[in-house]
Amino acid sequence: MRQACLRRPVVETLAMTYRSSALKRRVCPSSKTPDSRATLQSSITERILRELEHGVVPWVRPWGSGTATSVGIPRNGASGRAYSGINILLLWNAAAWNGFGGHNWLTFRQALELGGHVRRGENGTTAVYADTFVLEAEKLRAAQSGEEPHRIGFLKRFTLFHVDQCEGLPDTAFTKPMHLEEAMIAPRVKALLSASGADIRITGDQAYYAVNGDFIVVPPVQMFHDPNNWPRTALHELSHWSGAKHRLNRDLSGKFGSELYAREELVAELSAAFVCAELGIVPTVRHADYIGAWMGLLRKDERAIIKAASLASKAANFLMDFDRQGTPRPDPQDAEQTLASGALTPITPILVPAARAA
């Protein structure tokens, strides 16, 4: 039996950028849409589908354009809490469309509580959160049977404003993510990978996660034209690794070309983008050849992108815990020496040489 694995050729794909022609066709996010649950899900999916159809990948933020500052995850400007799931894509999308700098957002009330206000005429951006309810008939059934009632999940909308849309806010509302020098990125990723304890094998010319063997294969850094594509690729495969049954327990049984395979690839793609943004690495499209499959998936299931983004956030948080758990930060001088020496490999633990999975 062929060893089950999630694998792909290492193809250096160019990052999808926000082209001016695509921007002209994009629809600016707005909170003024009908308030049914079905409409909310479908409007989010339709927006992302339009992005993909126009060659714009929503999780590839144009970090180097216009007023964009540094790479980062959207956060609440009052609490500092990071937004998650589909809200990351919605807020990245709105920031790109409106040319906002930074990553901090507030509700209308939070802006007032901080001593400021939203400027007159500004339009908010729709964000969502999950809630549940119980049907009256289900409440009655549960009461009669003594069982817990079955709760139905749904999305509820709320409106956020970027701090650039506000006036009179304290400086704390404009906090920016710590900028990570490029020389620090590779050592930090290396430390995260090492802390994860993943079995990472540096060999061959393909990158994949072998499900049955629970190991990752990544080619040597020298095989990448852009050295930053090595950590991007490693984090993508580590995202697959996070879904193993004894970790986050996602269904990794999909065969290449199947819908289940496309779903998992979308989760890993989003998870890697979220982790890259947290680590100061500009996300890129690692799987441009899967975009067609993702569009088909979203057309078939309007909940697919929301579910994938939710699973991706869980995976990203799982991986970022290895970065947060006291992982030492390398000295900048040491980091430069690490890059200069090409010491992205080996990464421990390593088992080499490794046979290529069939």
Language-model features: where?
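N-terminal accessory/interface modules of nucleic-acid-binding and processing proteins
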Residues: 2-358
